[in-house]
Amino acid sequence: MPSSASRRGEIFLHRGDLAQARYWYEQAVMEARDFESLQALSDALGNLGNVCALLEAHTPAEVCYREVLDIQRTLQDGNAIGETLVNLGNLKTDTGQPELARAFYLEAVDTLTPLKNDRALGILHSNLALQEIQLQNTEAAIEAFQAALEFHRKVGNEDGLATTYGQLGKTFFLAGNSRKAEACLNNATEHFIKLGNGPGEAGALRLLADLYGERGDHISEVRCLERVVQIDKTYRLPQYEEDIRRYETLRQVE
């Protein structure tokens, strides 16, 4: 059962008061040390690490996560170990250290794959792919995105499918593979429509418009931008002014 300090930390976290949440989770860590409960200490340190990460206090967050990892390895909790490795990878991502982030993500893949935690593996492979892009490992990024799609399909993660298809489409586009980029971005658009995610749909359509523009397919480019402008208006997206200017310029060419 969570301690009173942990419960207070959770309350303040839900209220968005991260400073108070951090204070109470620090108290929870001290309580857990006093009671010599490894599981309680792991939980409290994990919560504290998460709050520190949200506060962009990266060094104390890493200290928490590393101690959590030691405890989880003692407890032999594979799924928890994988989650903490992902948290460490995310920290390195946030601090612009893609090589270290990649190393943590790869270790998490090795940990979670035998456990068949498909939902976590889908998200993890997407995270890994983004680091491969930062490291200019395009082929490795494409492979990781494709692996992510397989896991998203297994568990029916529509959000994951939509986002990953969009990311993979952008990767193919930047790599000069227009045909595969178009297929992925159309898939992304379909999934975003299914989810009712207008901003996501607009993002995929903007990339498609760029693709059609490079290809010289004026009609398809205009059609994509027409829909983007409609979404911009509906959701009051900040890209509206830029999108409408581009759309109107293209219409004048017709």
Predicted regions and their residues:
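Structural signature of alpha-solenoid helical repeat scaffolds
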Residues: E36, Q76, K116, G156, ...
